[in-house]
Amino acid sequence: MQIVEQMKDKALAELNLVKDKKTLDDIRVKYLGKKGELTEMMKLIATLPNDEKPKLGQAVNIAKQALQEAINLKLANFEEQELNEKLAQEKIDITLTGVGQNQGSLHPVTKTLNRIEAFFKQNGFAIEFGPEIESDYYNFETLNIPSHHPARAMHDTFYIDETHVLRTHTSGVQIRTMEKQQPPIRIIAPGRVYRCDSDITHTPMFHQVEGLLVDKDVSFADLKGLLHAFLNSFFEKDLKVRFRPSYFPFTEPSAEADIECVMCDGKGCRVCKHTGWLEVLGCGMVHPKVLKAGNIDSEKYQGFAFGMGVERLSMLRYGIDDLRMFFENDLRFLKQF
């Protein structure tokens, strides 16, 4: 038994001098491996008298347990040391200046379109699209725009050939929808439109959203209620809205909707030309001739339509005074949204 105790003390002394995991494992194999010194001691039990066998077995097991615990403790210390060294090497200096990340965002026109579409989808309107190169028939004739109307003039419209134009509005989508679908109809038609015009409030290409509702017992009061709710939602405030009589060949009666100037709260400023009001959209009850062109019985059904310029609404919502800024790709401007 004394030999076992001496062997244990020797092994523990060697452990105290270990400086690395490799040497530690060598000591483990030397004493606890299959051919280790303490393992070999267990083989001597068979040669001892019966009364001494339990004593030797107990002594060897105590020695092996003590040695294994010491090895485990030493190993844990090495692993903790390695972890601390690794953490020190990978340490992040949080006092250093951060690296800027260029994060993209939606164009203000896209944001405005999404906002418009979201409101009308919540109110049961579907979204319809149509071709940007439109025939004279869908762009003018079916919308009660006669051949002598100024909108057909070369200086107002981009002509592809004698019978096709770059659409001047998305109203053609309304006719196409009525041709393929019977009432009730609730649609909006967003998209690009084109006109021969370019200044701080006009560009040759801009975005428009037109809406159409056709059903039984539809009145101008329904139109006013819907548009008033839309404008309050879009500008996120309770606005004063007025409807002025106007003229559009495809609606009768027709009106233009104005809102109290969002820049000066109706007090009068440069944006509203000191009137206190801003024109935001056109609207009216669908003309019977337009319903007829879409194969809708105007005696049975009524409808209303409206149209708005997306850039115009964007300018008012974000306080932009030059329409051309939307299309100049100036990152100093676009990063603000």
From Swiss-Prot:
One of its GO terms (molecular function) is magnesium ion binding. Keywords: Aminoacyl-tRNA synthetase, ATP-binding, Cytoplasm, Ligase, Magnesium, Metal-binding, Nucleotide-binding, Protein biosynthesis. PANTHER family: PHENYLALANINE--TRNA LIGASE, MITOCHONDRIAL, PHENYLALANYL-TRNA SYNTHETASE. It is found in: Cytoplasm. Its EC number is 6.1.1.20. Tetramer of two alpha and two beta subunits. It comes from the Bacteria. GO terms for cellular component: cytoplasm. It is an enzyme of class 6 (ligase). Transmembrane segments: none annotated. This is Phenylalanine--tRNA ligase alpha subunit. SUPFAM superfamilies: Class II aaRS and biotin synthetases (SSF55681), tRNA-binding arm (SSF46589). Pfam families: Phe_tRNA-synt_N (PF02912), tRNA-synt_2d (PF01409). Disulfide bonds: none annotated.
